[in-house]
């Protein structure tokens, strides 16, 4: 991001807005947003003092209809212009999630907050047994994950449990996220968050600041009670 801001396009004059995306896949709720390179790029622009918008397209199936994508892009262009022209006070970046649904331009655009959720069913990675003379097919694995994301399926079945401990140092892993955790957290949430809005077919706009906001109510000096002990103790 900084290379683009400071080392390219200088002949065009100062950059007044950075658009990161569109990412083909939603960046809603905490678990997706915190690992999003799309939002990360917009945050990097924001900490450089440039207004920025992270744009993501939320798909629901693998039917990538060109007309639906075109409709989402047309809406995105209008929405970006609207946000740019009336930039909110205190906002450093916006996270925009546009659902890939028919007639999205006729559906609601909602202000939202980020749904606080978590991975609750265990690891999003699985150990895979790969013979020494073979390697995993990353392209095929990515395609399978995308199919699971579209269908809302988990990476592994309930009750399957984790892998047994293997007595060797080298392990290979594949990403097998438990999308059910995300979809259930959205279904159980109250209206008003980004995941809920997209699930309703509405476009979500979340105003953000480029920081990890502290929790209010903690102030002053921290005093440790009890006797001083060594940093390390033998058990």
Regions found by a protein language model. Name each.
Residues 42-71:
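Glycine-rich phosphate/pyrophosphate-binding loops
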Residues 66, 83-235:
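C-terminal accessory domains and tails appended to enzymatic cores
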Residues 2-11, 43-44:
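Acidic, metal/ion-coordinating pockets
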Residues 27-36:
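Glycine/threonine-rich flexible loop motifs
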Residues 72-79:
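Glycine- and Gly-Pro-enriched alpha-helical subdomains that act as flexible
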